[in-house]
A protein has these predicted regions:
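Class I SAM-dependent methyltransferase Rossmann-like catalytic core
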Residues: 1-32
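C-terminal lobe and adjacent flexible extensions of AdoMet/dcAdoMet transferase-like proteins
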Residues: 192-245
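A short glycine-rich, Lys/Arg-flanked "PGG" loop and its adjoining helix->strand segment in the class I
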Residues: 110-125
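Hydrophobic beta-strand segment of the Class I
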Residues: 97-98
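Conserved catalytic loop of SAM-dependent methyltransferase domains
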Residues: 168-193, 201-203
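Class I SAM-dependent methyltransferase SAM/SAH-binding core
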Residues: 24, 28-87
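Short, glycine-/aromatic-enriched active-site segment of Class I SAM-dependent methyltransferases
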Residues: 130-147
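Short alpha-helix
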Residues: 146-174, 206
Length: 245
């Protein structure tokens, strides 16, 4: 699953419906950002495009195995190809991290979360979107959410705790089936509302908002990679995030 596949999906009717539904669920979690430093991870650009207009600093990191696209479409480039286990940012730089099409596609979810933790400011917020292990979307390859490793809420809670994040809210998205039939897409918003009222257990996605925790003492050991890392040419040296749109 690379950026070409992801871009083609979001250009399709099913992708448009997905973006519309997920953006509606993400909007209240992103809130007013102002001068906050916002980092997208994985393939988060369809949702970074929907950030409030007053957002001044944002960057899109795409994992080496996926490839990278120019983002945003206009203005200076704010996207980069990175090793998700070795981000080219200094510590305590990011105020909000949005991870979409990321955690389920990495070789080591815990390492990825630990690296996100490193670059986030104290009490920085992480908004994580992953395929629901119980959901229909994980069972079909009609969308990118049918690839990679799905998660249950229990699994996510364990990973977040190990990476020193504290989950503060949970929600779900994509109650409609992952079909290419147009009549389903046209009624997607109604299906979403009805599904949210009945049950979210079998929704396509889990959305969790978590906060970075900084402890004076931690009994756990942070994971270290023993294999050589891929070092992309883009942004090779750690930088302090001062980018702007």
């Amino acid at each position: 699953m690379d950026v070409v596949d992801l871009r083609e999906f979001y250009a399709s009717p099913l992708g448009n419906a997905t973006r519309r539904l997920l953006s509606a669920k993400l909007k209240p979690r992103l809130g007013s950002l102002g001068d906050a430093c916002v980092m997208g991870m994985g393939f988060a650009t369809p949702y970074l495009d929907d950030l409030p207009s007053e957002t001044k600093r944002s960057i899109a990191f795409m994992m080496a195995r996926q490839g990278v696209i120019h983002w945003p479409r206009e203005g200076s480039v704010q996207s980069a190809l990175v090793d998700e286990f070795d981000l080219p940012l200094l510590e305590s730089t990011v105020d909000l991290a949005l991870v979409v099409h990321g955690l389920e596609l990495t070789d080591s979810p815990i390492e990825m979360l630990q690296e996100v933790w490193r670059v986030m400011a104290p009490q920085g917020r992480l908004v994580l979107v992953v395929p629901n292990r119980r959901g229909l979307w994980d069972a079909f390859d009609t969308s990118p959410f049918g690839y990679g490793q799905p998660f249950s809420r229990t699994q996510l809670a364990g990973l977040l705790k190990e990476a020193q994040f504290s989950a503060v809210s949970w929600s779900h998205a994509l109650q409609m089936p992952p079909t290419k039939r147009g009549f389903v897409h046209s009624g997607a918003s109604a299906i979403e509302r009805i599904g949210d009222l009945i049950t979210s257990r079998f929704s396509g996605l889990i959305i969790v908002e978590a906060v970075k925790q900084v402890y004076a003492f931690s009994s756990g050991k942070r994971v270290r990679r023993l294999m050589p890392r891929f070092k992309p040419a883009l942004l090779p040296s750690p930088v302090r995030f001062d980018g702007g749109q």
